[in-house]
């Protein structure tokens, strides 16, 4: 049978106290809405309709081209939100999943199980439920002696007996598509909130003697709806635990998984060692047998095998096999480090390519440069790439030796096998195999220091 999905993403999220629409707040690096959409994709819906409202344009940008959008200009409840999808889904045959966009922990596996349960039991509606240790505040699932769902009763309306029920409504449902939109025509706003409730549809089905079922989640965490920053932090914690556990199952070692942040799209090969306080974000990929030490931060970068990154930052760059970086190095966007490069402490690389086996051990800036293989940068080397208006490129060939405290002012090229003397300021090209000395000649004035007031003999 054909599946459809409706994602409810129109709410403002007042309790978040944010200008950002609630569903766009991030968990593990992507928005809650994206988490929900990815999970919904597991049921392979023929059509997905996302209901937007508050700051609709921002929400639509996140899933542009991936879903149909309809707008709920007035926030008149969950039932009203689902009504907005009628022009897209009416008269279609199949079952429709209705899910809130602020439930980032729900998994695709659970949604597939929900759909299968709905079909196998020939229900007109199926409620996704969970068993809560503390059900206070949730709608309760009331069943009869045959374990059939009778109704959903809200906390404020529940009797003393009903308040003892642990099974709660998660706010996710599957409906026979045609019957859903027929029933929506019969709900009203005769309630304390003056809104159209999707739960009223369940009551209509029961009154008609139609079959309503409930599928219970195995993991209560999946039911979490995020309405404030406290719940957002809870979702982040649960998602981080899931992600790290999966990496450990796949052969990655964590010194302290509770103090490690790995984004949902990060890929890590087996035999990688991750120490505490490491952050990996975006589309980062880490190769096998790499070591990431305490405090390392990597975003949208590809790291090769057998590399060692020590307490350093790497952004939007590529690092090949056998490279060592840090401590306290910064590899900025647009950089690439070839095999066996060493970038040491307090070295910054920006928008540059560095060839195999090149070494910049300490206190060096390499910007907008193309550096060959087997180059050695002495301590304090600076490529000067900016004149206040434009940035210029430095080209350094293979097997070049740059002495300490040298300043290389771009645009300039150092030829293969050339050598720059320590303390030089280079403003012109250096031919291959040449030695460049760009510093003032040293002059020694004998006994001149004795004339100075601080000399020992003058005290």
Swiss-Prot record:
Superkingdom of the organism of origin: Bacteria
Membrane spanning residue stretches: none
- Which keywords does UniProt give here? Acyltransferase, Cell shape, Cell wall biogenesis/degradation, Cytoplasm, Magnesium, Metal-binding, Multifunctional enzyme, Nucleotidyltransferase, Peptidoglycan synthesis, Repeat, Transferase
What InterPro entries does UniProt report for this protein, alphabetically? Bifunctional_GlmU, GlmU-like, GlmU_C_LbH, Hexapep, Hexapep_transf_CS, NTP_transferase_dom, Nucleotide-diphossugar_trans, Trimer_LpxA-like_sf
Q: Which reaction does it catalyse?
A: alpha-D-glucosamine 1-phosphate + acetyl-CoA = N-acetyl-alpha-D-glucosamine 1-phosphate + CoA + H(+); N-acetyl-alpha-D-glucosamine 1-phosphate + UTP + H(+) = UDP-N-acetyl-alpha-D-glucosamine + diphosphate
> Cofactor binding mode, per the note?
Binds 1 Mg(2+) ion per subunit.
CDD domains attached to this UniProt entry: GT2_GlmU_N_bac, LbH_GlmU_C
Picking any one GO molecular function of the record gives:
magnesium ion binding
Which GO cellular component term is one of those annotated?
Answer: membrane
Please give the subunit comment from the record: Homotrimer.
Protein name per its UniProtKB record:
Bifunctional protein GlmU
Biological source species: Streptococcus sanguinis (strain SK36)
Gene assigned in the entry? glmU
């Amino acid at each position: 049978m054909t599946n459809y999905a409706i994602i409810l993403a129109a709410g403002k999220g007042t309790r978040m106290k944010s200008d950002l629409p609630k569903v766009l707040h991030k968990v593990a690096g992507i928005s809650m809405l994206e988490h929900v959409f990815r999970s919904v994709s597991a049921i392979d819906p023929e059509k997905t309709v996302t209901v937007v409202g508050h700051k609709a344009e921002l929400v639509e940008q996140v899933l542009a081209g991936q879903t149909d959008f309809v707008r709920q200009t007035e926030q008149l409840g969950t039932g009203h939100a689902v009504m907005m999808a009628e022009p897209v889904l009416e008269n279609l045959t199949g079952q429709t999943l209705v899910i809130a966009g602020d439930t980032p922990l729900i998994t695709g596996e659970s949604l597939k199980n929900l759909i299968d349960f709905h079909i196998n039991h020939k229900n007109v509606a199926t409620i996704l439920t969970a068993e809560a240790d503390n059900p206070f505040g949730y709608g309760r699932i009331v069943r009869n002696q045959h374990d059939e769902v009778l109704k959903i009763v809200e906390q404020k309306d529940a009797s003393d007996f009903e308040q003892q029920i642990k099974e709660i409504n998660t706010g996710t449902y599957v409906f026979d598509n045609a019957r859903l939109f027929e029933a929506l025509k019969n709900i009203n706003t005769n309630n304390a909130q003056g809104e159209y409730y999707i739960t009223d549809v369940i009551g209509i089905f029961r009154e008609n003697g139609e079959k309503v079922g409930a599928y219970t989640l195995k993991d209560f965490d999946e039911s979490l709806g995020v309405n404030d920053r406290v719940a957002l932090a809870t979702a982040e914690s649960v998602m981080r635990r899931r992600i790290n556990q999966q990496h450990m199952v796949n052969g990655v070692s964590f010194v302290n998984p509770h103090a490690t942040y790995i984004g949902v799209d990060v890929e890590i090969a087996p035999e990688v060692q991750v120490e505490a306080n490491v952050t990996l974000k975006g589309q980062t990929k880490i190769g096998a047998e790499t070591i990431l030490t305490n405090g390392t931060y990597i975003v949208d970068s590809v790291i090769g095998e057998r590399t060692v990154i020590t307490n350093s930052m790497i952004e939007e760059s590529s690092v090949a096999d056998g490279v060592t970086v840090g401590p306290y190095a910064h590899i900025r966007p647009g950089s690439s480090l070839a095999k066996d490069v060493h970038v040491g402490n307090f070295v910054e690389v920006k928008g540059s390519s560095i060839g195999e086996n090149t070494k910049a051990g300490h206190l060096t800036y390499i910007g907008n440069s193309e550096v060959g293989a087997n180059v050695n940068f002495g301590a304090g080397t600076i490529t000067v790439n900016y004149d206040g208006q434009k940035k210029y490129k430095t080209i350094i060939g293979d097997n070049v030796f740059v002495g300490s405290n040298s300043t290389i002012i771009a645009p300039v090229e150092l030829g293969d096998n050339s050598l720059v003397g320590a303390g030089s300021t280079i403003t012109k090209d250096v031919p291959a195999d040449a030695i460049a000395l760009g510093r003032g000649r040293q002059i020694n004035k004998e006994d001149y220091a004795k004339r100075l007031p601080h000399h020992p003999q003058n005290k």
